[in-house]
Amino acid sequence: MSTADTTAAAAIDDPNVSSTKRITSVRRTAWDEPTGARLAMRYGLLVVITLLVLFPVYTTVLGAFTPSNRVLENRLLPGELTFDVVRNAWTEGRLGRYLANSAVVALVVTLFQLVTSMLSGYAFAHLRFPARNGVFYLFLATLLVPFEATVVVNLDTVQWLGDESSIFGGLNSLQGLAMPFLATAVGTFLVRQALLDLPRDLIDASRLDGLGHLGFIRRVAMPLVRPTLGALALFSFLSTWNQYLWPRLVIS
């Protein structure tokens, strides 16, 4: 009998140990030291899940190096490989420029969402103004409206704000691609919830030290809610990078 089994047995036999601790000790024994069959089943399941996740990536890479006339043959194993497709994408298709544009727009949107979410989240968490909760719930209600329902209005707004030479960009511009996504209700909600967990004594101490609202946000709040901001930045960048409908409409 292993040491863990001996400890679990002792915990079960000890009348001074509560029933909750007995169950916990038995559960820990079963999963901390799995048998060979259970360990093989666990790793087998992980391998299957990994293959399912990587299969679309594999087919995409395989299709990129397969001649155009053989892409639809649905072959799992690589046959004739060529770099012509990738080369044409970079030269004739200007893929490098498109990737750079996507990166610039995604970075700008991420930066603006972090700033606007931090400011609005702080306002809803620690500032006192009339109808604060009502305005916050109105922010959250915008999440119920799908983006497709506002596409026409956003498109008209971007077109009305100006052409490519104006500061707002308009259609066929990087500003037009980023404009509808510079602020997000999801970011406001996440930052507000994180700021509500800060102790009130910390805020009062910062006031005694002479920090204003912006000073508190920059020196105290931002370092403490860094995990939330990191998650928001990752979500914002990926969602902006993966957009298709809005760029397809704005860029003609």
Named regions from a protein language model:
Residues R38-S252:
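A structural signal for multi-pass alpha-helical bundles of membrane permease subunits
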